[in-house]
Amino acid sequence: MTERVQVGGLQVAKVLFDFVNNEAIPGTGVSADTFWTGAEAVINDLAPKNKALLAKRDELQAKIDGWHQARAGQAHDAAAYKAFLEEIGYLLPEAEDFQAGTQNVDDEIARMAGPQLVVPVMNARFALNASNARWGSLYDALYGTDVISEEGGAEKGKGYNKVRGDKVIAFARAFLDEAAPLESGSHVDATSYSVKNGALVVALKNGSETGLKNAGQFLAFQGDAAKPQAVLLKHNGLHFEIQIDPSSPVGQTDAAGVKDVLMEAALTTIMDCEDSVAAVDADDKVVIYRNWLGLMKGDLAEEVSKGGSTFTRTMNPDRVYTRADGSELTLHGRSLLFVRNVGHLMTNDAILDKDGNEVPEGIQDGLFTSLIAIHDLNGNTSRKNSRTGSVYIVKPKMHGPEEAAFTNELFGRVEDVLGLPRNTLKVGIMDEERRTTVNLKACIKAAKDRVVFINTGFLDRTGDEIHTSMEAGAVVRKGAMKSEKWIGAYENNNVDVGLATGLQGKAQIGKGMWAMPDLMAAMLEQKIGHPLAGANTAWVPSPTAATLHALHYHKVDVFARQAELAKRTPASVDDILTIPLAPNTNWTAEEIKNEVDNNAQGILGYVVRWIDQGVGCSKVPDINDVGLMEDRATLRISSQLLANWLRHGVISQEQVVESLKRMAVVVDRQNASDPSYRPMAPNFDDNVAFQAALELVVEGTRQPNGYTEPVLHRRRREFKAKNGL
């Protein structure tokens, strides 16, 4: 039973009340009385509005279901369908033209282009690694991944392999020649780097000296000008550093003593309270808020054991250099942090309102993450985040402009409680629900003075695509979804609308996640598509991936690319509304079995860690043992696809159960090396995780918008109660 404290009309879990009063509030200049009184007013006023918005979602979905049911067996009439969506208020008239008015935005968001990490803030180690991923070793990223092949004696091995190391050095020199070309010759032939008369001087093998083709790319150095330890260069708005140490193991093998190239990598990171965490009660929420507090105060630390030794990981300091004129240059040492609050759907029993109801979790997150961010705003931190006095909050899973307007209202109310200037709280709008996509311009307009980010989330968006049209018929296989007409239009529409509403220079236009953290050669080949599509940020699964993805922003001048794209014909809403129905469902029995098994295995691999271990984001081996980053968004697709096929008779419930049981054995085998893992087989009936996975599919048509949170939260609480956690 949760111990509670009565605060006005609110019943607050004691663990949360104590954290807020004893840890979060001191140093903010906000009194506890002011905060709790204001919080209660916000909850009393806005919780009913939140509830009404959710009812509107259900009402629209019921109407869409009914429309399709009434036309079962008929060919889809796209024109009639569009007219129907307009009639029920799903598809709204296009908003009048406007320009975003966001002010006081940090350069990492407004004027730079580069990778973005998303990490569960519940995990302090992941949070610290991401914060520190602003700068990453190119040599390590190349040496430790499949970007450099192991052919020709270049195996990774246990010790340093010079054959592999030489390949890394050659790759890095080629990058230097591309990003910072010399006036004559090549970085490959460099024998020394020095600073003379305010310029970078590069000595070459043939005895000559040269400089940069564009001398302005050299910004500063560390150490002695004649023999610098580091040389700082800039290209396409991104910094990188040639690190020099002839006495180091790698530097000894390099003609110029270069030991590494340090890349400016994860410009921004989303500290996630949402899809990548498993937080179901007050205890869990306090873990999240406490880690966010550590990030905002700059004192988050974690004991890390590696290679037999233990050390304390902390947030990196800023990087300090000497300019050619002798003055000091300081660059931000850490990724600029967003915090992703939860959406409007879930409630959490951390607070009960005056009627004893759980309070919407999104309202709680808005209040607490903003309160905590005051430590950064007022300088009560050793590691500054925003230098422009802003707090960056990503708001996910909003359906249409009314919900965006509600977020704008919530943020205004929170600012008033905390005594913050209007529009201090900025918003990142996830374009990951169909009703937001087709009304994106109006959604941005509803928060036009706060918006700092729009981002396509292909995974959740596909889940909503399937659920919205659940009654229309059987959808295509998961692997075919990316080549459906709607998705290309969706991705282009996000860029088109973002540019048309003046986000360039004020906000990020982002793209989604590379979900295969071990396949970095493939990422390096393919993910350049995101900056080419006009995105000035895109998601990566690890600091190493951020370092490698940064290379793409040196190849593509995103802001110039956006200027080109602004001239194209905007994406068509008719294309976006094209339902991804299978032209026929005459797949072979083997194809159906493979699709069901693949989805069942992914569902179980993720759900078992969520329910049993409280892990909301992990690298889950797929059916072919390829590690895939899974979070609730991937779960939403897999469960909704199987629910759709079940609904339309492509598969039977018996097939689903049989596949889940077979795949549970596979997942148990894949997790056999984890001492804390609890096998699902053979006791399926009593295994909470297995039953949760089954429920997500069998009850998938009845889940609100296809979301997985209601089942996951209830089942995780069941598991915790059953095991005394």
Swiss-Prot record:
<comment type="pathway">
    <text>Carbohydrate metabolism; glyoxylate cycle; (S)-malate from isocitrate: step 2/2.</text>
</comment>
<comment type="function">
    <text>Involved in the glycolate utilization. Catalyzes the condensation and subsequent hydrolysis of acetyl-coenzyme A (acetyl-CoA) and glyoxylate to form malate and CoA.</text>
</comment>
<dbReference type="InterPro" id="IPR011076">
    <property type="entry name" value="Malate_synth_sf"/>
</dbReference>
<dbReference type="Pfam" id="PF20656">
    <property type="entry name" value="MS_N"/>
</dbReference>
<dbReference type="InterPro" id="IPR048357">
    <property type="entry name" value="MSG_insertion"/>
</dbReference>
<feature type="binding site">
    <location>
        <position position="460"/>
    </location>
    <ligand>
        <name>Mg(2+)</name>
    </ligand>
</feature>
<dbReference type="InterPro" id="IPR048355">
    <property type="entry name" value="MS_C"/>
</dbReference>
<protein>
    <recommendedName>
        <fullName>Malate synthase G</fullName>
        <ecNumber>2.3.3.9</ecNumber>
    </recommendedName>
</protein>
<dbReference type="GO" id="GO:0000287">
    <property type="term" value="F:magnesium ion binding"/>
</dbReference>
<comment type="subunit">
    <text>Monomer.</text>
</comment>
<feature type="binding site">
    <location>
        <position position="313"/>
    </location>
    <ligand>
        <name>acetyl-CoA</name>
    </ligand>
</feature>
<dbReference type="InterPro" id="IPR001465">
    <property type="entry name" value="Malate_synthase_TIM"/>
</dbReference>
<keyword id="KW-0963">Cytoplasm</keyword>
<keyword id="KW-0808">Transferase</keyword>
<feature type="binding site">
    <location>
        <position position="432"/>
    </location>
    <ligand>
        <name>glyoxylate</name>
    </ligand>
</feature>
<feature type="active site" description="Proton acceptor">
    <location>
        <position position="340"/>
    </location>
</feature>
<feature type="modified residue" description="Cysteine sulfenic acid (-SOH)">
    <location>
        <position position="617"/>
    </location>
</feature>
<dbReference type="InterPro" id="IPR044856">
    <property type="entry name" value="Malate_synth_C_sf"/>
</dbReference>
<feature type="binding site">
    <location>
        <position position="276"/>
    </location>
    <ligand>
        <name>acetyl-CoA</name>
    </ligand>
</feature>
<dbReference type="InterPro" id="IPR006253">
    <property type="entry name" value="Malate_synthG"/>
</dbReference>
<keyword id="KW-0460">Magnesium</keyword>
<feature type="binding site">
    <location>
        <position position="541"/>
    </location>
    <ligand>
        <name>acetyl-CoA</name>
    </ligand>
</feature>
<keyword id="KW-0558">Oxidation</keyword>
<dbReference type="GO" id="GO:0006099">
    <property type="term" value="P:tricarboxylic acid cycle"/>
</dbReference>
<feature type="binding site">
    <location>
        <position position="118"/>
    </location>
    <ligand>
        <name>acetyl-CoA</name>
    </ligand>
</feature>
<feature type="binding site">
    <location>
        <begin position="457"/>
        <end position="460"/>
    </location>
    <ligand>
        <name>glyoxylate</name>
    </ligand>
</feature>
<feature type="binding site">
    <location>
        <position position="432"/>
    </location>
    <ligand>
        <name>Mg(2+)</name>
    </ligand>
</feature>
<dbReference type="Pfam" id="PF20659">
    <property type="entry name" value="MS_C"/>
</dbReference>
<feature type="binding site">
    <location>
        <position position="340"/>
    </location>
    <ligand>
        <name>glyoxylate</name>
    </ligand>
</feature>
<keyword id="KW-0816">Tricarboxylic acid cycle</keyword>
<dbReference type="GO" id="GO:0004474">
    <property type="term" value="F:malate synthase activity"/>
</dbReference>
<dbReference type="InterPro" id="IPR046363">
    <property type="entry name" value="MS_N_TIM-barrel_dom"/>
</dbReference>
<dbReference type="GO" id="GO:0006097">
    <property type="term" value="P:glyoxylate cycle"/>
</dbReference>
<feature type="active site" description="Proton donor">
    <location>
        <position position="631"/>
    </location>
</feature>
<dbReference type="Pfam" id="PF01274">
    <property type="entry name" value="MS_TIM-barrel"/>
</dbReference>
<keyword id="KW-0329">Glyoxylate bypass</keyword>
<dbReference type="GO" id="GO:0005829">
    <property type="term" value="C:cytosol"/>
</dbReference>
<dbReference type="Pfam" id="PF20658">
    <property type="entry name" value="MSG_insertion"/>
</dbReference>
<dbReference type="GO" id="GO:0009436">
    <property type="term" value="P:glyoxylate catabolic process"/>
</dbReference>
<comment type="similarity">
    <text>Belongs to the malate synthase family. GlcB subfamily.</text>
</comment>
<dbReference type="InterPro" id="IPR048356">
    <property type="entry name" value="MS_N"/>
</dbReference>
<feature type="binding site">
    <location>
        <begin position="125"/>
        <end position="126"/>
    </location>
    <ligand>
        <name>acetyl-CoA</name>
    </ligand>
</feature>
